[in-house]
Amino acid sequence: KVLHVAPEQCFYPIFKKQQNLNYTTADMESPIADLHFDLHKIPLEDDLFDVIFCNHVLEHVQDDHQCMKELFRVMKNGGWGIFQVPIDYTNKVTYQDSSITDPKERETHFWQKDHLRLYGLDYPKRLEKAGFKVDVFDPKTALGEIDYEKLRLNSSELIFIARK
C-alpha cells in the first residue's frame, strides 16, 4: 500500500498503472488526488501504508513536526517513506520565522513565497524526533551519472529515507 501526498505529475501515471500497487494519492486541493485532507490530522487509521511519498510538502505546513508524526502514525511497522524538502546545506539548523508573512520576504528567506521554513542539516534529526529512523542516500555517489531531470532529482540533493 502506497500513499503519495501531493503527487507529482511525472510519477502519478507511472504509479497509478502499476497493478502490484495499492496506490492512493492525497492532497488538500489537487483534482488528481484520491483523498483530500490536511496533513496535520490525517483522517486514516494507524499503520496503514507500507510506503509514503511526501515530497516538497513539509516546508509549506504550519506545524511540520505534527505532520511528521501523522506520517509516522499512518505508516506500517517496517514501512518507509521519502519526504524530500528544500535544504540549505550551509545551515546547521532549520530556519523559520513566523513573523515573515510577506511573499517577497518569504522568497528571500525561505527560497519560495509560500514556504514557511528553510530546512538545514538538522532535517534528519527532525524526522527522528517524530519517531522515524533515517537513512541518507546520495544519488550521485550511489547512481553516478543519471538523467536527474527525468527523475525529478536535484543532483546536489540528498535523499532521506524515513523508516518505521
Regions of interest found by a model, annotated:
Residues Q62-L71, K76, W80-K164:
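S-adenosyl-L-methionine-dependent methyltransferase catalytic module, highlighting the catalytic core
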Residues K1, Q19, E45-D47, N77, ...:
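Residue-level preference for short coil/turn positions at secondary-structure junctions
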Residues H56-H60:
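Short catalytic micro-motifs in class I SAM-dependent methyltransferases
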Residues L39-I52:
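A short acidic, Gly/Pro-enriched loop at the edge of an enzyme's catalytic core
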Residues F53-N55, Q66:
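PRPP/pyrophosphate-binding module of the type I phosphoribosyltransferase fold
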Residues V5, I52-F53:
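Hydrophobic beta-strand segment of the Class I
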Residues I32, P43-D46, V61-Q62:
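Activation segment
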Residues K1-K41:
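Class I SAM-dependent methyltransferase SAM/SAH-binding core
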